Amino acid sequence: MPSLKDLKNRIESVKSTRKITKAMQMVAAAKLRRAQEAAEQSRPYTERFNAVMAGLAASVGGSDSAPKLLSGTGSDKVQLLIVMTSERGLCGGFNTNIAKLARAHAQKLQGEGKDVKILTVGKKGRDQLKRDLGSLFIGHVDLTEIKRVSYVDAQGIAKDVLNRFDVGEFDVATIFYAKFVNVVSQIPTAQQIIPAKFEQQEGEEASTLFDYEPDEEAILADLLPRGVATQIFSALLENGASEQGARMSAMDNATRNAGEMIENLTIEFNRSRQAVITNELIEIISGAEAL
């Protein structure tokens, strides 16, 4: 049975931890508001850009002159997985869920006889995947010093990926991230970005509403690299909001659990102190009776 001093020390320790988790929850809440706004503001642009690109792609998809970023290499033998996670922990199952989805996809591809390569963005995913898939790593993007991701950061990642594609390092590229829904819901998502896939929105007829100059093929060749960067940027923003939402939820749970633990320890402390006082009274009474 722990002594009163031990129980008191544990109570103080848990109280100190609760202060930390509460502070982290408040910081995450503030960051979440900014990250959520950024993610939501980017969605209309991304959706409209994808709609226009879908119309262009539909008009030249079967053409022999279609850009390689759209038509592909003619093979899907070598697959590049771009796994986006956070640089910091204490965000519940956020990183684990993304890594789990990427790991399952990699194992599925390997089972089909495909060659898999992995590029990680964020050290938490790298640390989780390197245990069993480390031999597949071809690079890592460190975002530790970046407080708020920008389109320039996405362009840097896209440039590296496109350079690897141009020299024939892979045939298909897929990004893994968490799509933000709300504070308690972030959906691990896999999205192919090379060869480019643009879904035509219902009711959109971009290819018939506009005439393009000089022509669709030339415009696609110019816009497709930007499309890859846009999809990566959108994924980074969704990931940022998801990370802060997951951290806020995790710290809220930790704070409530700490409160419950303090209550239980306080009850145990009071019972132990009561037992000590009772024993002392019994000893005093017994001594008085002996006299």
Curated annotation (Swiss-Prot):
Coiled coil: none annotated. It comes from the Bacteria. The keyword Cell inner membrane applies. It is a peripheral membrane protein. Its main location: membrane. One of its GO terms (cellular component) is plasma membrane. It is found in: Cell inner membrane. GO terms for biological process: proton motive force-driven plasma membrane ATP synthesis. Signal peptide: none annotated. Keywords: ATP synthesis, Cell inner membrane, Cell membrane, CF(1), Hydrogen ion transport, Ion transport, Membrane, Transport. The keyword Transport applies. GO terms for molecular function: ATP binding; proton-transporting ATP synthase activity, rotational mechanism. InterPro entries: ATP_synth_F1_ATPase_gsu, ATP_synth_F1_gsu, ATP_synth_F1_gsu_CS. F-type ATPases have 2 components, CF(1) - the catalytic core - and CF(0) - the membrane proton channel. CF(1) has five subunits: alpha(3), beta(3), gamma(1), delta(1), epsilon(1). CF(0) has three main subunits: a, b and c. Belongs to the ATPase gamma chain family. NCBIfam families: ATPsyn_F1gamma, PRK05621.1-4. Produces ATP from ADP in the presence of a proton gradient across the membrane. The gamma chain is believed to be important in regulating ATPase activity and the flow of protons through the CF(0) complex. This is ATP synthase gamma chain. It comes from Roseobacter denitrificans (strain ATCC 33942 / OCh 114) (Erythrobacter sp. (strain OCh 114)). The lineage of its organism: Bacteria, Pseudomonadati, Pseudomonadota, Alphaproteobacteria, Rhodobacterales. The gene is atpG.
